[in-house]
């Protein structure tokens, strides 16, 4: 029997993959405001906000509203709920840097 993947497992994997790729990754938190995405990835002119979820889980309504506001302001916000999702994001970022 395999252990169920948790949000923290996906977050740890994202951190490791970003470090391997040479990206800056930071934990994020709004001051005096809720629903900030979990992580911010910065690399070569690209900035991506990342909301992490356990497999199959979806963002709460307040998070969805905040993501929509951020996207209207021209920000990229990705929601990731799997290790494969992390791999896909890293591959996209590497492709956009070329």
Residue positions per predicted region:
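Catalytic phosphate/metal-binding cores of nucleic-acid and nucleotide-processing enzymes, i.e., regions
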Residues: 1-98
């Amino acid at each position: 029997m395999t252990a169920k993947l948790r949000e923290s497992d996906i977050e740890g994997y994202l951190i490791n993959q970003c470090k391997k790729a040479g990206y800056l990754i930071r934990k994020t938190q709004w001051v005096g405001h809720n629903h900030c995405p979990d992580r911010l990835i910065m690399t070569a002119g690209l900035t991506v906000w990342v909301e992490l979820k356990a497999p199959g889980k979806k963002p709460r309504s307040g998070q969805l509203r905040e993501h929509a506001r951020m996207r209207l302001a021209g920000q990229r916000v990705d929601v990731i709920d799997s290790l494969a999702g992390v791999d896909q994001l890293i591959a996209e970022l590497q492709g956009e840097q070329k």
